[in-house]
């Protein structure tokens, strides 16, 4: 971004990764007269083929899970401990896992629950969950299945994508005032020469990884959160896309950031969706993560916008992005 007075905030010296303690934020769309919760019915264009990577399994690039997250040697060890019949050469990993789940009296669709019921030391189960499973689904979702996602819910999922791919960096989730002075707050602009989020203000596309995903909350850092939106930067393709499940244009601070990237990489294409995806009041966090997942999977941005997966699909994907 140019070093003019209008854009000096993003040219500040890089401070700490997070210059100060940030409010744990949530995101959703509050229903108002101008924000209807229902829209026109549309034909579904999204199927399980468009699901975000492996179901409940750690999204490790290039790894094939065959429907079961845990490795075969762990399943064979547990099978022996349970006294089950030895697995035959033709028995699939999925069949063995189902056999174990049945013996433990646990739904085989709930891979974390099966792991937790296995006769293994607690420390080993914790290590296996961290290596092979998606983050645990919050217990509060049982009674409130469409609860707004918060900062921690999103970070836990997206950091697995960063760990599972050596060509991807996740930034966030960050508040919309990421470029403000470190000592800014309600009613004060701040005078510090350090940026609130140093890794955003100091992002260098020349040295960055090929793909960068960013999730923002439209509230500033001192508020509790309002709505989640996202950016995806594809360095090899020289593109930067903005996604808002409500179909709104990038807010000024995000658009300035995107323009700054074009100064670093002349010819970079900027784009955003004009179509509204979300008609409920709760799935903006899921939409933002799903958008980044699909961009990493190579889905063209225009196709993604035309497909516009519905709220119901996003709600179902909570059992996909999080292990139960």
Where are each of the predicted segments found?
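Contiguous terminal or domain-adjacent regions
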Residues: 293-324
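Arg/Lys-rich, intrinsically disordered low-complexity tails that mediate electrostatic binding
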Residues: 1-44
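Cysteine protease catalytic domains with a Cys-His-Asp triad
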Residues: 38-229, 235-240
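Alpha-helix boundary/capping residues
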Residues: 161-164, 261, 291, 308
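Cysteine protease-like catalytic core of ubiquitin/ubiquitin-like
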Residues: 205-303
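Exposed alpha-helical structural elements
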Residues: 153-157, 253-257, 312, 316
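Residues that form generic nucleotide/phosphate-binding pockets
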Residues: 157-161, 257-264, 320
């Amino acid at each position: 971004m140019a070093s003019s007075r209008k854009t000096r905030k993003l040219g500040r010296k890089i401070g700490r990764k997070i210059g100060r303690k940030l409010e744990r934020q949530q995101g959703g769309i509050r229903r108002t007269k101008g924000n209807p919760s229902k829209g026109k019915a549309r034909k579904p264009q999204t199927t399980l083929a468009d699901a975000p990577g492996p179901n409940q399994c750690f999204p490790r690039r290039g790894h094939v899970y065959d429907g079961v997250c845990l490795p075969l040697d762990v399943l064979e060890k547990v099978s022996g401990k349970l006294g089950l019949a030895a697995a035959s050469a033709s028995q699939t990993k999925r069949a063995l896992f189902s056999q174990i789940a049945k013996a433990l009296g646990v739904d085989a669709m709930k891979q974390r629950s099966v792991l937790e019921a296995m006769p293994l030391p607690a420390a080993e189960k914790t290590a296996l969950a961290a290596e092979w499973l998606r983050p645990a689904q919050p217990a509060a979702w049982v009674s409130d299945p469409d609860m707004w996602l918060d900062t921690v819910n999103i970070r836990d999922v997206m950091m697995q994508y960063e760990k599972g791919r050596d060509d991807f960096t996740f930034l966030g989730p960050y508040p919309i005032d990421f470029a403000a002075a470190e000592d800014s707050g309600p009613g004060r602009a701040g005078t510090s020469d350090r940026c609130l989020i140093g890794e955003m203000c100091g992002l260098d596309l020349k040295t960055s990884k090929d793909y960068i995903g960013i999730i923002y909350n439209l509230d500033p850092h001192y508020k509790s959160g309002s709505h989640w939106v996202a950016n995806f930067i594809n360095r090899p393709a020289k593109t930067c896309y903005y996604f808002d499940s409500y179909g709104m244009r990038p807010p000024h601070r995000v658009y300035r950031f995107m323009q700054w990237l074009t100064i670093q990489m002349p010819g970079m294409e900027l784009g955003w969706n004009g179509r509204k995806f979300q008609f409920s009041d709760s799935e903006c966090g899921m939409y933002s993560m799903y958008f980044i997942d699909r961009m990493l999977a190579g889905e063209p941005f225009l196709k993604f916008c035309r497909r516009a997966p519905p709220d119901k699909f996003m709600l179902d994907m909570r059992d996909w992005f999080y292990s139960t």
